[in-house]
Amino acid sequence: MTKNEYLIEKLQANLANHITELTSAYGEVTIECEVHNLLPVMIELRDREEFSFDQLIDLCGVDYLHYGDYDWETESATEHGFSRGVERQEAKAYAVNKPRFAVVYHLLSTKKNHRLRVKLFVEESHLIVPSVHHLWKSANWFEREAYDLYGILFDGHPDLRRLLTDYGFIGHPFRKDFPLSGEVEMRYDAKLQKVIYAPVDIVPRIVVPKVIRNDNRYIGNEGSKND
């Protein structure tokens, strides 16, 4: 029996009533649970001898907005952009019938030498998840980062402040609907002789997937494509 097979067996035996999904792919085991079951599941994973997950090595947020789209919706841009070269697809590559946001935890057992990914989806209208900082101290800054970048609140966190963005920053920059150029820029005003904040004056450009067209512009004299 491999380590992953052993882990899956113990998860099914001890946490079947608390998890909604269990998968094993690419050598990694992943479980999903509801928000209200997070703390009971995490306590079992840390304290039960069969698991012994003594380290939280990563925690992050995920935004699944537009996940599975074949291509992006384009808007007017220089020379009409590249939308004319994209064949629109009616269906998505992947269908996700779950809330937009998720929180992902990666656990490591130094005693058992196995790893586990724990995922839970959070309703956009109620982005609140219990903090696990009292179980693993490393969660402190991980949770602050997820709050800063995605706006996910961690109930019970002792110091839930922004971690990476500037003072007074508005919005959460890793959300898929956050503008690439941002909302506010900081610059030096020579007239006022001080640093000021102002709305960005960058004109958004449309970033689109590369489109390869098989027409005469890309065919060499001998009928072969140029490198």
From Swiss-Prot:
Main location: membrane
Superkingdom as given in the UniProt entry: Bacteria
Assigned GO CC terms: plasma membrane
Gene3D superfamilies linked: NADH:ubiquinone oxidoreductase, 30kDa subunit
The protein's Enzyme Commission number: 7.1.1.-
Reaction(s) catalysed (UniProt annotation): a quinone + NADH + 5 H(+)(in) = a quinol + NAD(+) + 4 H(+)(out)
Family: Belongs to the complex I 30 kDa subunit family.
Complex and partners: NDH-1 is composed of 14 different subunits. Subunits NuoB, C, D, E, F, and G constitute the peripheral sector of the complex.
Function: NDH-1 shuttles electrons from NADH, via FMN and iron-sulfur (Fe-S) centers, to quinones in the respiratory chain. The immediate electron acceptor for the enzyme in this species is believed to be ubiquinone. Couples the redox reaction to proton translocation (for every two electrons transferred, four hydrogen ions are translocated across the cytoplasmic membrane), and thus conserves the redox energy in a proton gradient.
Protein name: NADH-quinone oxidoreductase subunit C
Source species of the chain: Legionella pneumophila (strain Paris)
Gene that this sequence comes from: nuoC
